[in-house]
């Protein structure tokens, strides 16, 4: 029986030393699922609310005992006796019980942890892997693929204490024939980059997502360093390895002046000027994907950016869409970007996450599954990427066990599925590429 008999919440620690919510869901047949909510550093203003205690005397106000109390109290009471396999029903019960637009009463961190734990318990009860259960919930049973990783090997912005304003410089092993081979290629470039940075006198300390966080003279210098690292590792840029960036431009947008300020290199841009700045980088390097290239509220600027670059490369909305189908629907209607970043905790439940992925795919958008800067050992996003055949995943660099946990889970899944889960490389990325 997959009937829920116990729901338990607790406060645990994330990869940045901040508390987060972990939940357990126990079923009548002895099955148990456990999951933890991640937490972001650069967050969209329209994300579902992450409930924090606000008690400055405890964890600097970042405790999550209120959210844990919600799990152990009203959420547990509402879910006990329900069928864990009926994910949509469970999620709707929690959403209705919370009763707010952005899950402000219980916190998206509480609802999400329980939502994912219930899915894991249901998979155990069905005696299937989590990715298989997710495929069932997605209405695509038995349809899988291994995701092309976006590996964040230079961290800037809110993810690092350095002079680099653009938040993530990533590599994608598009020339690999399997995920395992792609992971190896990424690791080799990562270690090659360490040598390049050291030789130039830069620090090889890492940021929140495991990438290096050097002080560089410009954002373009990050791309130049990666170019050298790729060549030194024995790979060809544009053939074996392509590049991607997450600008997280809301973090350097000045709302008072309406300007984009790259303080690290002393430059200021209007929205159109910044779009042309990005176009220049795309013309210089094989960049196939740019995320959050403008402020989350700059829809006119995004329209211009999409007209300028949307036929050439993948333009990903993260802070722009916050995994929210209502906002995504507007983007699709207005022709804004061509891809969405998928983060569980931006919306706060598995069911709503699956709905966002489906809406994106139905509209011809790509969907990139993503971690957050504050992570745990929980590797659910690996199963989500495979179980929805999303095609791409962002889960950091090749260091820090909170990042590597997801890669290791993907290795296990590929081993189990073999040819049933193809690795499609650059075919998964939106754009027309002529390198």
From Swiss-Prot:
Gene Ontology CC: cell surface; extracellular region; phosphopyruvate hydratase complex
Keyword Magnesium listed: yes
Keywords per UniProt: Cytoplasm, Glycolysis, Lyase, Magnesium, Metal-binding, Secreted
Cofactor note (record): Binds a second Mg(2+) ion via substrate during catalysis.
Key word Cytoplasm present: yes
Pfam families: Enolase_C, Enolase_N
Binding site for (2R)-2-phosphoglycerate: 167, 343, 372-373, 394
UniProt: Mg(2+) binding residues: 246, 291, 318
Pathway: Carbohydrate degradation; glycolysis; pyruvate from D-glyceraldehyde 3-phosphate: step 4/5
Compartment list: Cytoplasm; Secreted; Cell surface
HAMAP family, alphabetized: Enolase (MF_00318)
Family of the protein in this entry: Belongs to the enolase family.
Function noted in UniProt: Catalyzes the reversible conversion of 2-phosphoglycerate (2-PG) into phosphoenolpyruvate (PEP). It is essential for the degradation of carbohydrates via glycolysis.
Complexes and interactors: Component of the RNA degradosome, a multiprotein complex involved in RNA processing and mRNA degradation.
Protein known as: Enolase
């Amino acid at each position: 029986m997959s009937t829920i008999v116990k729901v338990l919440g607790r406060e645990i620690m994330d990869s940045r030393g901040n508390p987060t919510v972990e939940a357990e869901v126990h079923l009548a047949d002895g099955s148990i699922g456990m999951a933890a909510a991640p937490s972001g550093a650069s967050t969209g203003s329209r994300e579902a609310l992450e409930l924090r205690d606000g008690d400055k005397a405890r964890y600097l106000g970042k405790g999550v005992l209120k959210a844990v109390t919600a799990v152990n109290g009203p959420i547990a009471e509402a879910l006990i006796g329900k069928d864990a396999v009926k994910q949509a029903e469970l999620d709707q019960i929690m959403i209705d019980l919370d009763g707010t637009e952005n899950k402000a009463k219980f916190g998206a961190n509480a609802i999400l942890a329980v939502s994912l734990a219930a899915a894991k318990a249901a998979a155990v009860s069905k005696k299937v892997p989590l990715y298989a259960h997710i495929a069932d919930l997605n209405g695509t049973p038995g349809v899988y693929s291994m995701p092309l990783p976006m590996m964040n090997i230079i961290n800037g912005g809110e993810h690092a204490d350095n002079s680099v304003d653009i938040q993530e410089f990533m590599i994608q092993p598009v020339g690999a024939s399997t995920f395992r081979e792609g992971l190896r290629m990424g690791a080799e470039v990562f270690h090659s980059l360490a040598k390049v940075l050291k030789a130039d006198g830069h620090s090889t300390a890492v940021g929140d997502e495991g990438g290096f966080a050097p002080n560089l003279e410009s954002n373009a210098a990050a791309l130049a360093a990666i170019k050298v690292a790729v060549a030194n590792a024995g790979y060809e840029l544009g053939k074996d390895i392509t590049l991607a960036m997450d600008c997280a431009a809301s973090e350097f947008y000045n709302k008072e002046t309406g300007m984009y300020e790259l303080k690290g290199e002393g430059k200021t841009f209007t929205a159109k000027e910044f779009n042309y700045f990005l176009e220049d980088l795309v013309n210089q390097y094989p960049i196939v994907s740019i995320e959050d290239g403008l402020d989350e509220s700059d829809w006119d600027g995004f329209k211009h950016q999409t007209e300028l670059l949307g036929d050439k490369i993948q333009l990903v909305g993260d802070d722009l869409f916050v995994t929210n189908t209502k906002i995504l629907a507007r983007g699709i209607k207005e022709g804004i970007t061509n891809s969405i970043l998928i983060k569980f905790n931006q919306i706060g439940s598995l069911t709503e996450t699956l709905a966002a992925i489906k809406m994106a795919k139905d509209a011809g958008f790509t969907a990139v599954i993503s971690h957050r800067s504050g992570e745990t050992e929980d590797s659910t996003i690996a199963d989500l990427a495979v179980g929805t055949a999303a095609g791409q995943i962002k889960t950091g660099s090749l260091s820090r066990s909170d990042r590597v946990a997801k890669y290791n889970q993907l290795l296990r899944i590929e081993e189990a599925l073999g040819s049933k889960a193809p690795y499609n490389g650059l075919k998964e990325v939106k754009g027309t590429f002529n390198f």
